[in-house]
């Protein structure tokens, strides 16, 4: 497998950064994909598009994870996305903290800000509807709180969602958060972590994510995701911590 490596000179702007894309497959019809900077630009992108009956019935169940870090009173967001709001296109430009992107059959992102850095590795389990996301978190001279906001969905991979179509029964058990779609109560989406604390969010929908390539194809390119919980992880000063995430059906 050839290794492709890129650095900040390759995404001087948001629009440049979404021109290069990656994809990973699981061997049974499921896949993952996004852009080099982590912003989705196509309806068919996400961290886990599962094949409900291999190799067909492909559904987006796990779109992505947005990350923030809080150091003292300062919070930095690493979210990289494009949305439509109040008739305008708005950008979350977390790629400004992205220092490297590597594709070697799986995906590696590295981010850095004052007093904190982290690496993020995304891959799929072969012959299973399982996405693994591994983090390595490094704090500088101050204690940090690293917060993950997972974005979930349940839609056919070429469609789009609205808040009205994203309804779930949810519950937490041990270190896992479960979502059962109202549209299909025969499956459960499981989001499992090696550590951290789940907390409920006041805003539970990510509304009108705008997918630029779909816009270029003369559609509205809008999608919605369900994000009912945050996962918070404490990182003490001058330490490195590894955290593992599994999302599966």
Ranges and model annotations:
Residues 1-249:
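Terminal accessory carbohydrate-recognition/targeting modules of carbohydrate-active enzymes
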